[in-house]
């Protein structure tokens, strides 16, 4: 859509909220997937709709932007030349950037039980442990490895006792797929590289961690905060240190930054 069309849609959403009489939240999944020019056009329309909003012409209560690009990276592109806040509230405010946490080990086990019920694919205990150790519950990595297992296994055999189709992937198969991901130009890992591309301070911090240095967690540190919000870093189990989110990211970043 053109920018005027996007603005018309935003104003329409405001009318919907007004008629509902309830707060309306708009969630845009993969908001950064379209060409950058289109993404910027849509987000500028949100700015315009917000600037026009009042009691008689409301805008939506909130907009959730879900994607790989940290929304702070778009700020300069959204602000026209000379658009400074000068102490007042900016029209482009991100109330809270959030990196959705990965699955806990308990949640991953629960997901795999449901997966086994639906698909007949029952990972061995060692395979479940390997999946956890490799991914640390990162949802895309978990999903991708399970998908690849499905592709490799084909139609599961049927158990003579229950007549259910059953197959049991091994830890070795999980390990092989995880290593295979590093050799693919998959969009997810490329997006991990985009997070640090051209950001010298982020690269330096990651290289320190890759070198085995212990780094204390500090949300006040802008570089740490950026990498935590982007999902590349996570707090350690003790909550005292930062660490790279999972071994797959670690191996990818080592290859990327070591070149």
Give residue spans per PLM region.
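Short, conserved clusters of charged catalytic residues that mark active-site
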Residues: 8-11, 45, 126-127, 219
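Short glycine-rich substrate-engagement loop in P-loop NTPases that contacts/grips substrate
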Residues: 1-14
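Winged-helix-like regulatory helical subdomains adjacent to P-loop NTPase cores
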Residues: 106, 113-232, 236, 247, ...
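The catalytic "switch" region of P-loop NTPases
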Residues: 23-25, 33-134, 148, 152-182
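Conserved phosphate/pyrophosphate-binding and hydrolysis machinery centered on Walker-type P-loop NTPases
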Residues: 2-3, 36-39, 135, 242-246
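Glycine-rich phosphate-binding loop signature in dinucleotide/nucleotide-binding domains
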Residues: 18-22
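Short, cationic-aromatic polyanion-contact patches
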Residues: 238-258
